[in-house]
A protein has these predicted regions:
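Positively charged n-region of N-terminal signal peptides that target proteins for export
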Residues: 1-5
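Bacterial N-terminal signal peptides
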Residues: 8-18
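Compositionally biased alpha-helical segments
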Residues: 20-150, 157-168, 173, 177-184, ...
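Conserved positions within tetratricopeptide repeat
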Residues: 97-98, 139, 173-176, 210-213, ...
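Extended low-complexity acidic/polar segments
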Residues: 144-153, 224, 256-267
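TPR alpha-solenoid repeat register
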Residues: 155, 192, 229-230, 267
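TPR/TPR-like (Sel1-like) alpha-helical repeat modules
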Residues: 216-221, 242-265
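Extended alpha-helical scaffolding segments
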Residues: 229-232, 236-249
């Protein structure tokens, strides 16, 4: 019994994993039909399904269904998404592009279908292009997202990346114009935190140090759970406090940054 139990448990686990995997790779059509990903191939704007013919030995036929008749798809999370996001965090936009481009090609036919990963990949590409200084290409990506009816918060993330690049390039007026257009469309905390940081940078460039500080501090006050945005906000606050001559608070904020986010690029920059 002691030898059979582990084997039985293993088989149960493998069966459960197989069921989950099968479910997560399924096409659901408007007519109620559902087909496993392994049973189809994509041909242009259609999904070609292999169908076994009853009463024949090994007989099969192909059924062609338009992608437009898809209701949703269950697709496993592509590893390329997380890998490309990690590249962006490490300030490696070119590497992020290399990882996300194949994913976008794969997901492109399903860009408007619920469950597709195209929008997430498109956001990564827009951000990467913006950070590489390719604002026009990033704008093209955002327009594709709009046509695909992407979530406004996803579009806002790409917009913010372009705006950040404009600020870094000294084009503060153009950055402010674009920022004013998206402030009322973003609703998620990540986008709102990013907007606060970007506004802080615009104020900083304009010499409005107190306004910059207040904008940076909105992140720890209102969006404290956004750990991905916190290092940039704290670094901006440190710069502002230095410029205001408030060295004790600057030192305390530096301690917070280096203690809570020791491996962040912002912590390394703050120590220089």
């Amino acid at each position: 019994m002691s030898r059979r139990l582990p084997l039985f448990i293993t088989l149960v686990i493998l069966h459960a994993v197989a069921l989950v995997t099968a479910h997560s790779q399924t096409f659901y059509f408007n007519d109620g039909r559902k087909v496993s990903l392994s049973e189809v191939r994509i041909k242009g704007a259609n999904i070609v399904v292999s169908v076994k013919l009853a009463g024949t030995e090994g007989g099969s036929a192909e059924l062609t269904l338009p992608i437009s008749t898809l209701k949703r798809i269950d697709w496993p999370v592509p590893a390329a998404i997380a890998q490309a996001e990690d590249d962006l965090k490490a300030d490696k936009p070119a590497d992020a592009l290399q990882k996300v481009n194949p994913l976008l090609s794969e997901q492109d036919p399903f860009r408007e279908v619920s469950g597709s990963w195209w929008t997430q990949g498109a956001v990564v590409k827009a951000v990467a292009l913006a950070r590489l200084g390719k604002d026009v290409d990033a704008d093209v990506m955002l327009e594709l997202m709009r046509r695909a009816k992407a979530d406004p918060d996803a579009i806002a993330r790409g917009e913010i990346a372009i705006i950040d690049q404009l600020v870094a390039s000294g084009k503060a007026d153009a950055a402010k114009t674009r920022l004013d257009k998206i402030q009322n469309t973003a609703s998620d905390d990540a986008s709102l935190a990013a907007i606060a940081i970007t506004k802080g940078r615009i104020f900083e460039r304009a010499g409005r140090t107190e306004d910059a500080l207040l904008s940076y501090l909105r992140v720890p006050v209102y969006y404290a759970s956004e750990n991905g945005k916190m290092p940039a906000a704290l670094l901006g606050a440190i710069r502002a406090l230095h410029n205001l001559g408030d060295e004790p608070r600057a030192a305390a904020t530096l301690e917070t940054l280096t203690t809570r986010y020791p491996n962040s690029p912002e912590a390394a920059e703050a120590k220089r």
